[in-house]
Amino acid sequence: MQLEKMITEGSNAASAEIDRVSTLEMCRIINDEDKTVPLAVERVLPDIAAAIDVIHAQVSGGGRLIYLGAGTSGRLGILDASECPPTYGVKPGLVVGLIAGGEYAIQHAVEGAEDSREGGVNDLKNIGLTAQDVVVGIAASGRTPYVIAGLEYAHQLGCRTVGISCNPGSAVSTTAEFAITPVVGAEVVTGSSRMKAGTAQKLVLNMLSTGLMIKSGKVFGNLMVDVVATNEKLHVRQVNIVKNATGCSAEQAETALIACKRNCKTAIVMVLKNLDADEAKKCLDQHGGFIRKALEKE
């Protein structure tokens, strides 16, 4: 696909005079364009749902969710992956973010990194990619060699693959088994795909990881019941989670959390089923960590 023919490289008529307007009008133009992004994502919800189901199936079988991208796309993958352990209590290696150019590229531009097909393959080899894993290639343009080569390598190993781009019919879309293509149109600043395209990618990644965690029993109602209390704010959140899930007092919630070494799931089952910490943990373990299943047990 030629660069000048890509939607993400097109000229946006709405912002053609943005350098001549007031600061407030500038913000309005950007905001008006941003409003279109959730609608673009809405149009690909069935594709996102299909990807979530595949990711959940693979992760349930011992696989990992691996994001692969360059520049903004790679940074968004790393951001999403890094939030999963504290939010959902999963091991750091379960959701992995890889970026062309390595760790240095998180904060700096690495010239030519996205053009390295070898880099995409080697980065996946270095984390021991297996057929159980799911590789999600992220590229707004859909033409990034680093990502395309990584998806091709993953396919050769038998991995399930997902491609996220913002240009229909792109190489990323056609290389991946599952294509998610929110078409957000031309950017306010021509070609600056960190803007609308990046926002769309972030919304999609939010859904992929959150959907995986919900289907894995990491959410009860809408509560993040596997949150790890790494600071005072999260200690308070744990108490509130147990309170909201059970209707108990803050004191009862804190007592239960202390007894079970601050595991919200265990504390909730303790309170609702009147069990001690060991009994509640055993009950949860017998039901795969799903609170609802544990509560349904007679």
Curated annotation (Swiss-Prot):
Similarity comment: family membership: Belongs to the GCKR-like family. MurNAc-6-P etherase subfamily.
Function in brief: Specifically catalyzes the cleavage of the D-lactyl ether substituent of MurNAc 6-phosphate, producing GlcNAc 6-phosphate and D-lactate. Together with AnmK, is also required for the utilization of anhydro-N-acetylmuramic acid (anhMurNAc) either imported from the medium or derived from its own cell wall murein, and thus plays a role in cell wall recycling.
Entry EC no(s): 4.2.1.126
Record SUPFAM superfamilies: SIS domain
Gene3D superfamilies, A to Z: 1.10.8.1080, Glucose-6-phosphate isomerase like protein, domain 1 (3.40.50.10490)
InterPro entries found in the cross-reference section: Etherase_MurQ (IPR005488), Glucokinase_regulatory_CS (IPR005486), MURQ/GCKR (IPR040190), SIS_dom (IPR001347), SIS_dom_sf (IPR046348)
One annotated GO molecular function: carbohydrate derivative binding
Record's subunit section: Homodimer.
Entry-linked PROSITE patterns: GCKR, SIS
Active site: E83 (proton donor), E114
Keywords: Carbohydrate metabolism, Lyase
Catalyzed reactions: N-acetyl-D-muramate 6-phosphate + H2O = N-acetyl-D-glucosamine 6-phosphate + (R)-lactate
Protein name: N-acetylmuramic acid 6-phosphate etherase
Residue ranges crossing the lipid bilayer per the database entry: none
Enzyme category, top tier: lyase
Protein origin, superkingdom: Bacteria
Protein's UniProt keywords contain Lyase: yes
Miscellaneous: A lyase-type mechanism (elimination/hydration) is suggested for the cleavage of the lactyl ether bond of MurNAc 6-phosphate, with the formation of an alpha,beta-unsaturated aldehyde intermediate with (E)-stereochemistry, followed by the syn addition of water to give product.
Species of the source: Escherichia coli (strain SMS-3-5 / SECEC)
Annotated pathway: Amino-sugar metabolism; 1,6-anhydro-N-acetylmuramate degradation; Amino-sugar metabolism; N-acetylmuramate degradation; Cell wall biogenesis; peptidoglycan recycling
